[in-house]
């Protein structure tokens, strides 16, 4: 049991690291494309450096705000999903009970199988 919990914890840590690296790589790519128009020099000039600092800061700040909103909304979202799940699992049960207690209906013996007016 202990080993299984450790494996789950390691898997969660790997998922967190992967998610972080995906965000970091995307941010790096986006800011580099916006702020470094040419690769003629080895070092960044002051304008490029300021642009990168501003771009990364803006994306990090946005990410923090999104995560705060996500953390705030998550309990309500989980609660709603649980209610939906419970309602969905109750519907088939109720339908089965209705089928067992309701009298069977027979089809009307009208013009079945005959095409339209005659």
Swiss-Prot record:
Compartment list: Mitochondrion inner membrane
Spans through the membrane: none
Comp. bias regions, Polar residues: 98-109
Coiled coil: none
Topology term for the membrane: Peripheral membrane protein
Annotated InterPro entries: Mito_inner_translocase_sub, Tim10-like, Tim10-like_dom_sf
One annotated Gene Ontology cellular component of this protein: mitochondrial intermembrane space protein transporter complex
Disulfide bonds: 31-55, 35-51
Record has Protein biosynthesis as a keyword: no
Main location as per UniProt: mitochondrion
Keywords: Disulfide bond, Membrane, Metal-binding, Mitochondrion, Mitochondrion inner membrane, Protein transport, Translocation, Transport, Zinc
Positions occupied by motif Twin CX3C motif: 31-55
A GO molecular-function descriptor: metal ion binding
Domain of life: Eukaryota
Chain positions covered by the region annotation Disordered: 89-118
Any GO BP annotation: protein transport
UniProt subunit comment: Component of the TIM22 complex, which core is composed of TIMM22, associated with TIMM10 (TIMM10A and/or TIMM10B), TIMM9, AGK and TIMM29.
Family, as annotated: Belongs to the small Tim family.
Role summary: Component of the TIM22 complex, a complex that mediates the import and insertion of multi-pass transmembrane proteins into the mitochondrial inner membrane. The TIM22 complex forms a twin-pore translocase that uses the membrane potential as the external driving force. In the TIM22 complex, it may act as a docking point for the soluble 70 kDa complex that guides the target proteins in transit through the aqueous mitochondrial intermembrane space.
Alphabetized PANTHER family for the sequence: MITOCHONDRIAL IMPORT INNER MEMBRANE TRANSLOCASE SUBUNIT TIM9B
Domain notes per entry: The twin CX3C motif contains 4 conserved Cys residues that form 2 disulfide bonds in the mitochondrial intermembrane space. However, during the transit of TIMM10B from cytoplasm into mitochondrion, the Cys residues probably coordinate zinc, thereby preventing folding and allowing its transfer across mitochondrial outer membrane.
Protein's UniProt name: Mitochondrial import inner membrane translocase subunit Tim10 B
Source species of the chain: Bos taurus
């Amino acid at each position: 049991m202990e080993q299984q919990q450790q494996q789950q914890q390691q898997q969660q840590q790997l998922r967190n690291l992967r998610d972080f690296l995906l965000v970091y790589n995307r941010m790096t790519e986006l800011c580099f494309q916006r702020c470094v128009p040419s690769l003629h020099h080895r070092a960044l000039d002051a304008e490029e450096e300021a642009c990168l600092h501003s771009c990364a800061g803006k994306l990090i700040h946005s990410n923090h705000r999104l995560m705060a909103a996500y953390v705030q909304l998550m309990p309500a979202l989980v609660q709603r999903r649980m209610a939906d799940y419970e309602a969905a699992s109750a519907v088939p049960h109720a339908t089965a009970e209705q089928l067992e207690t309701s009298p069977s209906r027979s089809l009307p013996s009208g013009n079945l199988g005959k095409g339209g007016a005659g």
